[in-house]
Amino acid sequence: MSETFAELFEKSLTETDLRPGALVKATVVEVRPDRVIVNAGLKSEGIIPASEFRNEEPHVGDEFFVVIEASDNGFGETRLSREKARRAKAWSELEKAYKAGEMVKGVIIERVKGGFTVDLNSVRAFLPGSLVDVKPVRDPGYLEDKEIDFKIIKMDQRRNNVVVSRRAVMEAETSAERQARLEELQEGQEIKGVIKNITDYGAFVDLGGVDGLLHITDMAWGRVKHPSDLLNVGDEVHVKVLKFDRDKKRVSLGMKQLADDPWAKIERRYPVNSRVFGKVTNITDYGCFVKLEEGVEGLVHTSELDWTNKNIHPSKVVQSGEEVEVMVLEIDEERRRISLGIKQCKRNPWQEFAEKHEKDEKITGKVRSITDFGMFIGLEGDIDGLVHLSDISWTESGEEAIRNYKKGDEVQAVILGIDPERERISLGIKQLEGDPFMEFVESYDKDAVIQAKVKEVESKQAVLELADQVLGQMRLADYTYDRVKDLTQELNVGDEVAVKIVNVDRKNRLINVSHKAVEGRSEKGTRTVSDVPTKTTLGDLLKEKIQSKDE
């Protein structure tokens, strides 16, 4: 079968597959002399030949996995195989043992040309005659029908081909050198060995009959791209035994453990905010690694390369092998990580700007970009200041006002705020001029009558121009004491109306006015216009306020 037992088992848990070859779980419902009847959750009962239950006696209620051979054998029965399921599981276990180099148990069941057939838990394997023992054996009959240990030396499940060796087992068990080495090996022991093989993840070291694994992470305290960068087959190395599993005869070795850990007390040698020199060892899309000393590297993240170019690729700032000055930003000794910065070794343009300029100062720059929330103005030091939509015009909405600008335009603005730590400069264009709304509000007399001009009129309200760039709102109820249902029947755009201010909403920049407040009532209830002098312009209001102060 091409699928492993683990794959078939997983599939049996997630889906119901009724095709021949599918693995399903079955429960014994009846045991007969020639067959075993099981319930496998199929349309009909399953039949398993009794011959497949060798060396075991099935009982009603027993559960096990079976393979579907035929969903209908012509008699309304489903033919199942316990043996094929057992073999699928056996193949999976043999594959694990083969990859791990572990021994397996089997029985020599017959002689064939050139060797023997070995039963490895329902899987047949070939044992070459030359691999039966460490020396030639004339009559190996004494080994037949006995469970003994073998080592798999070749395996191909698709071709149903397994080759085993008893000789390899005996050599491992009877090697005097190996036994002696195994007995003397201790964790923490320093020993010499020879590099036997190199892989992507490490190197195998011959310690004298015993092989140990020197993992790539235990070769050096620093970064190792590939074991072949440090070692060659045949090299004699000095290593330390890190871990020794006597039962599985596995040895883990280390080279870097022979030297002091460079990360120990590293904060004393590299205090945070200290500036040091290092060599660029690796460049990635997210930053560059800088070697501070043997076994100690730190990362300069892309955001810490340059003050103004946040998304610049590291390769445009540094080169591999280049010596650079860096500042230690953060140290995590436990995780063996150091965060470094290159830009911190240069003057901060945001801080320089803050030292040279003050709030409310006027500056000039060119529009670099326009966004949904405002526009960025280029300033000295290759930094930007933001003019928010709300700071472009006093009278127009930000969305309308920003249409008057395009990229490259030179504009003048007022500095509203400088925040070097957050790298932000707030600018305003409307602040170049006084706020007509606030100037009007601060100058008007509560009892003053204003001659306003109708700008817009609807049935329930009207918008009036109180002064240049200052508008007020008058509701229908504030127009007159008389019964009026529709302002459009009383007022036209351009009409002048005498009004008084009845409310000012500074937060929402809204002025409510009333014509009714200007009117008076006679004793008979007739309407009269108040004798309060009429002020027609903002200038008149300011002039009157100044005169009242002088008096």
Swiss-Prot record:
Q: Which InterPro entries does this entry report, sorted A to Z?
A: NA-bd_OB-fold, Ribos_protein_bS1-like, Ribosomal_bS1, Ribosomal_protein_S1-like, S1_domain
Picking any one GO molecular function of the record gives: mRNA binding
Keywords per UniProt: Repeat, Ribonucleoprotein, Ribosomal protein, RNA-binding
- What organism does this protein naturally occur in? Coxiella burnetii (strain RSA 493 / Nine Mile phase I)
- GO aspect biological process, one term: translation
The organism sits in which domain of life? Bacteria
What's the name of the protein? Small ribosomal subunit protein bS1
The record's annotation in CDD domains points to: S1_RPS1_repeat_ec1_hs1, S1_RPS1_repeat_ec2_hs2, S1_RPS1_repeat_ec3, S1_RPS1_repeat_ec4, S1_RPS1_repeat_ec6
* Similarity comment text for this entry: Belongs to the bacterial ribosomal protein bS1 family.
Q: Which GO terms describe its cellular component?
A: cytosolic small ribosomal subunit
S1 motif domain ranges (all copies): 21-83, 101-167, 188-256, 273-343, 360-430, 447-516
**Cross-referenced Gene3D superfamilies, in alphabetical order?**
Nucleic acid-binding proteins
Q: Which gene encodes it?
A: rpsA
Keyword DNA-binding listed? The answer is: no
According to its UniProt entry, what is the function of this protein?
Binds mRNA; thus facilitating recognition of the initiation point. It is needed to translate mRNA with a short Shine-Dalgarno (SD) purine-rich sequence.
- Pfam families linked to this entry: S1 (PF00575)
